[in-house]
């Protein structure tokens, strides 16, 4: 045990698809260092990807391993710790039962991270690495995470993420899904490549920044690729030429599958993982012009440990999420031909109203971000059809991959965009009813603010360049200067005022002063 005085200890337990991992680290003299790392193989991924459930045999094994990890944490006098789970538990149909039993048997609260949460944490450490490696030279990069059950993509323009998407197809899941075909063909590799083409060929990487110049990969199979290539992995990253990876892939494809493990001294399961990871990596090379692949050491627990031991880093992470989420939403809005000037106008107005009402809405920065996303994306439904464009917008937004945002958060943003006209939320709707009372209140509050902001640019001509907002007694006073004809905006504002007052108990009033006075 290497714990020292005047240090803080924290731990992360990661329930992965094929490993149960724990990392214990300490903060001493402003530096984070590892005290211990443990990992045990599990087969949760194989089980879930083939049966959709985690068996009680696997649950009992997992519980016993967690008890052992708990004892190790006591030995190190660990303070804060987090237990997180990713794809396997996320996709298990009986995940609620599993999480409940682990809470009862181990007194551990398991956080099942959604795809975008998991990827954003990993990408944040990749971005830290790129910041150090590139220095002042800011270059674009396609950052991809090859997990056991998912592949995550993000495009970095040198300052922020501008695109993010997840595919439910990782290295283990890819092999397990197609394993039934393996005995029916002598060219299993061709089947895998064709399947990857059908899945990944529809990814539309933004081209605003030109060709993506760097390809950055991370994930569970990366160390395996490095081992087979005899690459030194002692530093914080390593690089392998694309030609070398393609040649390795050709060698694997030309050998009978049973000989791959013998040739590279790998267990059968590792050989399957090597092939699947390489197949995905080769396909990802099509999205970049780089002649090499960068493999930084960036794992989920790196970010979680950092946030626990250095709390201010979590504030920086949240700001990174906000900037990248807005950037991704703006790129999607452009693809759907949304009116950028209008959406930016009401986004500014909505944020001003939100910020001046902190004592009345009780919402935080995350909900403010949802308001911004709704403003940016609320017109995307017009791309499908003018008829029922609000419902079209709702259907599109709720299923969007926006950097760092959860499914529930995107559902809330979709509802805010859905009710931006003359309609108001109804708790009788199945979707609204599926939200908790707390989240339904969030929807109502954001809708009330959003509709008021949208009314101020009803003509979509930005007649009001700016507004000032103040609360006075039981009134919300919104004032502006303009010489334009604002009859439409005043009418829309009056239509939205009753619902706003119903939600907040404040009567909104609009005061326009002529700019000529």
Where are these regions (language model features)?
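Short glycine-aspartate micro-motif
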Residues: 10-14, 141-145
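Non-catalytic pre-domain segments flanking phosphatase-related domains
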Residues: 1-7
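Beta-strand initiation motifs
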Residues: 30-35, 160-162
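Short beta-strand scaffold segments in enzyme catalytic cores
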Residues: 20-25, 151-155
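Helical "lid/coupling" subdomains associated with nucleotide-phosphate turnover
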Residues: 10, 27, 47-75, 88-93, ...
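Short, non-transmembrane amphipathic alpha-helical segments
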Residues: 486-507
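A short amphipathic beta-strand at an alpha->beta junction
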Residues: 291, 504-517
């Amino acid at each position: 045990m290497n714990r020292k005085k005047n240090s803080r200890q924290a731990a992360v337990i990661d329930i992965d698809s094929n490993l149960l991992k724990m990392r214990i680290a300490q903060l001493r003299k402003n530096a984070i260092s590892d005290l211990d790392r443990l990992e045990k193989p599990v087969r949760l991924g194989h089980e879930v990807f083939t049966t959709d459930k985690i068996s009680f045999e696997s649950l009992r094994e997992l519980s016993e391993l967690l008890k052992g990890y708990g004892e190790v944490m006591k030995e190190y006098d660990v303070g804060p710790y987090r237990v997180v789970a990713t794809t396997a538990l996320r996709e298990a149909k009986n995940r609620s039962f599993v999480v409940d039993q682990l809470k009862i048997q181990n007194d551990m609260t398991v956080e099942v991270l959604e795809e975008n949460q998991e990827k954003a944490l990993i990408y944040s450490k990749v971005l830290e690495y790129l910041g150090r490696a590139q220095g002042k030279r800011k270059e674009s990069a396609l950052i991809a995470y090859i997990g056991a059950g998912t592949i995550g993509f993000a495009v970095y323009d040198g300052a922020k993420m501008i695109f993010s998407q997840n595919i439910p197809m990782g290295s283990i899941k890819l092999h397990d899904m197609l394993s039934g075909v393996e005995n029916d063909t002598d060219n299993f590799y061709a089947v895998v490549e064709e399947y990857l083409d059908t899945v990944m060929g529809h990814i539309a990487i933004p081209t605003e920044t030109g060709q993506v110049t760097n390809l950055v990969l991370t994930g569970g199979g990366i160390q395996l690729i490095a081992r087979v290539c005899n690459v030194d992995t002692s530093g914080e990253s390593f690089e392998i030429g694309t030609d070398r990876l393609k040649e390795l892939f050709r060698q694997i494809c030309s050998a009978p599958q049973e000989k791959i493990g013998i040739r590279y001294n790998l267990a059968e399961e590792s050989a399957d993982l090597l092939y699947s990871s390489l197949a995905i990596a080769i396909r990802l090379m099509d999205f970049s012009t780089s002649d090499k692949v960068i493999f930084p050491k960036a794992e989920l627990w790196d970010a979680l440990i950092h946030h626990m031991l250095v709390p201010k880093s979590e504030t920086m992470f949240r700001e990174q999420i906000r900037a990248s989420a807005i950037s991704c939403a703006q790129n999607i809005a452009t693809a759907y031909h949304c009116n950028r000037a209008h959406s930016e106008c009401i986004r500014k107005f909505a944020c001003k109203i939100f910020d001046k009402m902190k004592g009345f809405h009780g919402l935080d920065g995350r909900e403010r971000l949802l308001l911004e996303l709704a403003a940016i994306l609320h017109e995307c439904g017009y791309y499908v059809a003018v008829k029922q464009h609000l419902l079209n917008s709702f259907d599109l937004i709720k299923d969007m991959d926006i950097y760092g945002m959860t499914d529930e958060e995107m559902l809330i943003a979709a509802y805010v965009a859905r009710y931006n006209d003359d309609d108001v939320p109804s708790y009788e709707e199945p979707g609204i009813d599926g939200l908790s009372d707390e989240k339904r209140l969030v929807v109502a509050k954001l809708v009330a603010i959003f509709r008021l902001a949208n009314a101020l640019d009803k003509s979509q001509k930005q007649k009001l360049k700016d507004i000032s907002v103040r609360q006075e007694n039981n009134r919300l006073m919104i004032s502006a200067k303009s010489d334009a004809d604002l009859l439409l905006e005043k009418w829309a504002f009056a239509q939205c005022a009753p619902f706003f007052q119903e939600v907040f108990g404040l009567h909104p009033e609009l005061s326009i002063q002529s700019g000529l006075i």
